[in-house]
Amino acid sequence: MPKVGIAAQAGRTRVRRAWLTALMMTAVMIGAVACGSGRGPAPIKVIADKGTPFADLLVPKLTASVTDGAVGVTVDAPVSVTAADGVLAAVTMVNDNGRPVAGRLSPDGLRWSTTEQLGYNRRYTLNATALGLGGAATRQLTFQTSSPAHLTMPYVMPGDGEVVGVGEPVAIRFDENIADRGAAEKAIKITTNPPVEGAFYWLNNREVRWRPEHFWKPGTAVDVAVNTYGVDLGEGMFGEDNVQTHFTIGDEVIATADDNTKILTVRVNGEVVKSMPTSMGKDSTPTANGIYIVGSRYKHIIMDSSTYGVPVNSPNGYRTDVDWATQISYSGVFVHSAPWSVGAQGHTNTSHGCLNVSPSNAQWFYDHVKRGDIVEVVNTVGGTLPGIDGLGDWNIPWDQWRAGNAKA
């Protein structure tokens, strides 16, 4: 057993011994004054058989965070019981199946609190006993937890243990629309080492992002705790569970695609490690400028324009088998192998918006980038990748991002 636990247990033992010693000494003194005989100390009084008025003042008092018969008790906070003018001698709590609920007694013996989540729509019974100089107090109460009409589950990216790029935001996606965005944000705790200032921004009614003002520093450790269980998220929607994740920021990998040169240049920690010719979107379907975040990677994928609203049989439609595809936008932009356009790469833009590269370069890119790395596209005739694309977060100005849109 850890030394800390032993010390805490020893502390509680000393507190109880002190109270019990005081109880015995008081009982002896009261017996000696009242009887003046040698028959030994009088028995400790209990509430039902109180002795002197002085003892009435020292009867322990029990206070609970819930009331007997309560219905709709929230489950986002511990249930607790506290003793005054005495110490807790025994506390038990069980659910409607008789299963004990875990709890912890404070070192001073004055407070007991649950340490596990309570279930929705469950009935619980709490029994507590306290000892004081004036006797013992007991209390039993039964209550029922809330029964939400709707539940929503949060999902967090990056995954636990991942090493990601300097541009990776924290992403929390719910499986239902969130009416009270502010309540959701308050339930999310993000801790970084070293400390970094960041802010929330909602891409839509279900997904909120958190990022710093500038790209992460390599080596930064990030812990995310989404504590939405039991939290009212508006319009009868409550959190279904809590979720935690820990991830680390890896090397800085930034690729720049310049339409003036039609070259994709990859830098790792500021040093150029690879340059490759590319063919980007033709004038009728130009590649948008801006900062893209690397998402998923596929050794093989079927690209279908209908997945982002362009029918396959339309002039700009397509359905094509593609190898070594690295996603950089939710709107369908990839860095991928395009053997059919090798002759145009470095000279002419021929694609529907993707960054076409040779098969060997596409495989190299696939092998050397990771989720959260950055691709910046510059000098095209296109507009700017929308910040709410899903992988375009860094295109939203920091002042706008920091101001947030929880009330939108």
Swiss-Prot record:
Single biological process term from Gene Ontology: peptidoglycan-protein cross-linking
Q: Which domain of life is it from?
A: Bacteria
GO CC list: plasma membrane
- Notes on activation and inhibition: Is irreversibly inactivated by the beta-lactams carbapenems via the formation of a covalent adduct resulting from acylation of the catalytic Cys; imipenem is the most efficient drug for in vitro LdtMt2 inactivation.
- What are the subcellular locations of this protein? Cell membrane
The residues annotated as the active site are: 336, 354
Membrane topology, as annotated = Lipid-anchor
Residues with a covalently attached lipid (S-diacylglycerol cysteine)? 35
Positions contributing to Ca(2+) binding = 232, 235-236
Q: Where is this site: Binds to carbapenem drug (covalent)?
A: 354
The region annotated as signal peptide is 1-34
User: What keywords are annotated for this sequence in UniProt?
Assistant: Acyltransferase, Calcium, Cell membrane, Cell shape, Cell wall biogenesis/degradation, Lipoprotein, Membrane, Metal-binding, Palmitate, Peptidoglycan synthesis, Signal, Transferase
Q: Known EC number(s)?
A: 2.3.2.-
Task: State which pathway it belongs to.
Answer: Cell wall biogenesis; peptidoglycan biosynthesis
Please tell me whether the keyword Metal-binding is annotated for this protein: yes
* L,D-TPase catalytic domain: residues covered: 253-378
Kindly report the protein's main subcellular placement as a broad class: membrane
Which Pfam families does the UniProt entry name for this protein? Answer: Big_10 (PF17964), YkuD (PF03734)
GO MF term (any one): peptidoglycan L,D-transpeptidase activity
Q: What class of enzyme is it?
A: transferase
Provide the residue positions that the database annotates as binding substrate: 318, 331-332, 356
Q: Quote the residue positions with lipidation, kind N-palmitoyl cysteine.
A: 35
* Further information: The peptidoglycan structure of stationary-phase M.tuberculosis is atypical since it contains a majority (80%) of 3->3 cross-links synthesized by L,D-transpeptidases that predominate over the 4->3 cross-links formed by the D,D-transpeptidase activity of classical penicillin-binding proteins. In fact, 3-3 cross-linkages predominate throughout all growth phases and the ratio of 4-3/3-3 linkages does not vary significantly under any growth condition.
Q: What is known of its domains?
A: Consists of two tandem immunoglobulin-like Big_5 domains in the N-terminal region (residues 56-145 and 150-250), followed by a L,D-transpeptidase catalytic domain (residues 251-378) and a C-terminal tail (residues 379-408).
State its role.
Generates 3->3 cross-links in peptidoglycan, catalyzing the cleavage of the mDap(3)-D-Ala(4) bond of a tetrapeptide donor stem and the formation of a bond between the carbonyl of mDap(3) of the donor stem and the side chain of mDap(3) of the acceptor stem. Is specific for donor substrates containing a stem tetrapeptide since it cannot use pentapeptide stems.
Q: This chain belongs to which protein, by name? A: L,D-transpeptidase 2
Organism in which the protein naturally occurs = Mycobacterium tuberculosis (strain ATCC 25618 / H37Rv)
